[in-house]
Amino acid sequence: LKNDKDFINKTSVIYNFIDAEEILRKSQEKVTDCCKEKTFTFLNVGRHTEEDKKLTRLIEAAKKLKEDNLYFRILLVGSGNKTQEYKKMVNEYKLENNIIFLGKKQNPYPYFKLADSLILTSEYEGFPVVYLEAMILNIPIITTNVSDSLRIIQNKHGVVTQKNVNSIYNAMKNAIINGISQKEEFDYKEYNQEINEKLEKLINA
């Protein structure tokens, strides 16, 4: 298919619509199971599978941050076949007070409101809807260079790192020391309108 120019010319990449009003509404629920003390907080939301999500990178980066005597917290929302392995790694590195396993959450959005930054350390992704969720809730993003991250995130909604522990660690350290913010507000209405226009164009082609 890559060599079929006619086919390529007739294709278009269309991302997901996003129900921003629902996300904003759900984010107002109160969190009661963590985070009473104020400290710089990273949030990771997703499956605990190492082949793609590579949470070992995040844990290794956290180890280096602790060695620097930096104060931080990482909230892990999700579960998977590597959860127990990750918990063992956290215990071995004595990171129990820094990395909190929250399990799956039917409504993860209140935890976004607790975070100073969303963080993804993946090796590969499709289009991460979690990017859009964070952008709607005005949460800056630290992510490895996957999918469309450079176009969507860099210099607008956060920082894009290389796929290695040192690059992730440096971005996290800089965020803790100097802060991190979205430089552009995400216009979800415009985003959904663009998706709708692409769909109409395909339907009418």
Regions inferred by a protein language model and the residue ranges of each:
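Short hydrophobic beta-strand element within catalytic cores of glycosyltransferases
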Residues: P140-T143
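Conserved acidic donor-binding segment of nucleotide-sugar-dependent glycosyltransferases
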Residues: N155-N166, N174-G179
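Aromatic "clamp/platform" in nucleotide-sugar-dependent glycosyltransferases that forms part
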Residues: K104, E123
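Acidic anion/phosphate-binding donor-loop and adjacent secondary structure
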Residues: K2-N3, Y15-C34
